[in-house]
Design a protein with these regions (language model features):
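Single conserved hydrophobic/aromatic residue that forms the stacking wall/gate
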Residues: 1-8, 12-13
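Short, glycine/charge-rich flexible loops or terminal/linker lids adjacent to PRPP-binding catalytic cores
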Residues: 62-100, 108-114
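PRPP-dependent phosphoribosyltransferase catalytic core
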Residues: 117-191
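Short glycine-rich phosphate-binding loop at a beta-alpha junction
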Residues: 46-55, 130
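A short, well-structured juxtamembrane/interface segment
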Residues: 29-48
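Glycine-rich phosphate-binding "P-loop"
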Residues: 16-31, 107
Length: 191
């Protein structure tokens, strides 16, 4: 889904939620994503000790990838549980482990980098983050750079726009508006 809806001749851009969890319902798509995430991790990162998924959207794919790679899996909550052990990281993770974090979608990077910080605070090395999709918002790119985290994604906003043009969901004339929205979606004004 892209953040565009045509209403008559007026173009309306709204906040969009790219729900990658729906891909879990389609075995061929689910398997493709699992294989591609595993391929990226195998090619980009050496001597990985564990895979961590960001709750909740990346738990399932993270577990599938960890299983395929034969690695331990943990997941990272956005906030500690308020009962029981009150864990932020669920599963067995040893301090000093080299961890690749899997995320489903990166928008501003806030929740993703909070997960990175949780793993670092636990005493582990974050090798990098691999995600299914990113909007490529400038604020996220700057945040990942500041946090010194390598982010690799399977797809991105530009690829979605290219596919939307190719399949005639939008036409070339609408690309500039959609790219302008991406620069600062919170303050975007369609004028």
């Amino acid at each position: 889904e892209i953040p565009l809806r045509l209403v008559g001749s007026e173009m309306c851009i709204r906040d969009s939620y790219n729900d990658n969890r729906k891909t879990l319902s389609y075995p061929v798509v689910r398997s493709f994503i699992k294989l591609e995430l595993a391929r990226v991790i195998s090619e980009k990162f050496e001597n990985v000790d564990a895979i961590a998924g960001v709750a909740t959207g990346a738990i399932a794919q993270g577990a599938l990838v960890a299983d395929l790679l034969g690695l331990p899996f943990v997941y990272i909550r956005s906030t500690p549980k308020d009962h029981g052990l009150e864990n932020l990281i669920e599963g067995e993770l040893k301090p000093g482990s080299k961890v690749v974090i899997i995320e489903d979608l990166v928008s501003t990077g806030g929740s993703s980098l909070k997960a990175v910080q949780a793993v670092r605070n636990f005493g582990c090395d974050v090798a990098g983050m691999v995600a299914i999709f990113t909007y490529g918002f400038p604020v996220a790119e700057a945040a990942f750079k500041d946090a010194k985290v390598t982010l690799t994604t399977l797809s991105n906003y530009d690829a979605v726009l290219e596919e939307a043009v190719r399949t005639h969901y939008i036409d070339e004339s609408e690309i500039a508006v959609l790219q302008e929205w991406r620069k600062d979606p919170a303050n975007w004004d369609p004028k």
